Amino acid sequence: LHGVAMILFAADNHYGTHAGQNLFECLRPHHEIHFREDDWRCLVEENLAVTYDLLMFHLIGGTCDVPAPGPVAEQQVKKYLQAGKPMFLLHGSSAAFWQCAWWRSIVGFRWVRKDDPDGFTPSSHPIRPYLVEVAKSRHPLCQHLQDVAQPADEIYINLEQSCPATTLMTTTTEEGTFPMAYETITPWGGKIVSYLPGHAPTAVRHPGNVANCRSIIEYLITPT
C-alpha cells in the first residue's frame, strides 16, 4: 500500500512576502509537507529521493539577503532528480539554482536574472491584475486546473525556453501570450511542473491558486 506522500518544500522569504510560507499554510491541511524558509540545511540531507516523494521550491538562489543553496545542496538536489523523482517549481524557482548550467537546461522556461550566465536578456514582471487560463491542451493535468482571475500581482513574462515543455496554463497581456504553468521531463525521466503565479499574499492565497497547486501536487505524487 502506498503510504502518505512526503513532500519537502523549501522557500525563501521572497522579499518579505513570505509567499512560500503563505502557500504552505494553505496546503498543510491536505498534504504531509516538511516546510523550511531561508534554511537550506534540509537540502543537504543524504537520500532526498528515499525520504521524499516530491520536492517543492519557492526560491530564487542568492536573493532576499539569504545565501544561495551551496554546492552540497545542489548535488543532493541533482541526485534526487537523477533518481527520476518529480519536482514542483513555484513562481521564480526556475532560478533556484540559476548559477548551475545543468539546472538552467532542464527547467523548461526559466526566469532570467540580470547578468545571466547564458547571456539572455532578463525576464520581467509587470504588476497588474491578470487572468490565468487553462491551456488548450490534452495534457491530463489540464482537466484538473482552473482559470484564475488574479489580483494585481507580478506577471512573469519573457522567460527563456531552455528545453521542451508542455504549456498547461497561459496569460494574455498587452505584451503577448505567455506560459503560466508548464511541464517538462528531466533527462532522468522525472516530471517538473512549474506554476508561475503567486507573489503577493492575496494572490498566493487565492482559492483558485491553491486549488491549482493542490492539483499539481496530486498529479506529481500519483505513481504512473
Question: Whereabouts are the PLM-identified features?
Answer:
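Solvent-exposed loop/turn segments at secondary-structure junctions
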Residues: N13-Y15, G61-C64, S93-F97, H199-P201
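Short hydrophobic segments within beta-strands
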Residues: F9-D12, L90, Y195
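Short, structured active-site "lid" loops
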Residues: V50-V66
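Extracellular ligand-binding/catalytic regions of CAZymes and related secreted enzymes
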Residues: G3-V4, Y15, P187-T224
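A glycine-rich, often tryptophan-bearing local segment used as a flexible ligand/cofactor-contacting loop or short
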Residues: D65-C142
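Aromatic-Pro/Gly-enriched surface loop or interdomain linker
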Residues: L1-L54
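Catalytic beta-strand/loop cores that center a nucleophilic Ser/Cys/Thr
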Residues: H18, E25-E32, T51, G119-S194
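Extended, composition-driven regions rather than compact fold-specific motifs
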Residues: A10-N13, R36, P71, W98, ...
